[in-house]
Design a protein with these regions (language model features):
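C-terminal motif of bacterial Sec signal peptides marking the signal peptidase cleavage site
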Residues: 13-15
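Sec-dependent signal peptide recognition
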Residues: 2-9
Length: 138
């Protein structure tokens, strides 16, 4: 009985220790949070991203970019969706932190409608996050 419990635990442990899919990057700058938010809003279209939500009071912005050129050997696969989630906040000493999370989703067309499955962040979304931070670092 004990060996079955131990074997079950050993088999489930790797499933619980998965790596996070999102790629997080951050930077600190001397500009005010409002100015950093304006910079992010200005730079996102230059990177090909479309703003999908904005919380001006909390200095958060989300943007999406669709990759319709990606192909998979699955008839239900539709496209890849790259998302940038940016959160800006004041830090001690008058600095402002800019935190960017890049995420990639595979969008499938199923019987219940469009379904997104999160994948490891693509190189494209990681590159866009780095370029965004470099442009808005000040």
């Amino acid at each position: 009985m004990y060996s079955r419990w131990l074997l079950g635990t050993i088999l489930l442990l790797p499933a619980c220790a998965q790596q996070p899919y999102a790629a997080s990057t951050s930077a600190r700058t001397q500009v005010a949070p409002e100015q950093a938010l304006e910079c992010v809003k200005r730079e996102l279209p230059k990177l090909g991203y479309k703003q999908s939500s904005l919380d001006a009071a909390e200095h958060r912005i989300n943007a999406t970019k669709y990759d319709t050129e990606a192909r998979r050997a699955d008839v239900q696969f539709r496209r890849l969706v790259n998302r940038l989630e940016v959160e800006i906040g004041p830090e001690a000493g008058g600095q402002t932190s800019i935190d960017v999370q890049g995420r990639t989703f595979a969008e499938y067309t199923t019987q219940r409608g469009p379904t997104e499955v999160e994948e490891k962040a693509s190189a494209e979304v990681n590159d866009a996050a780095q370029k965004l931070l470099a442009a808005c670092r000040g």
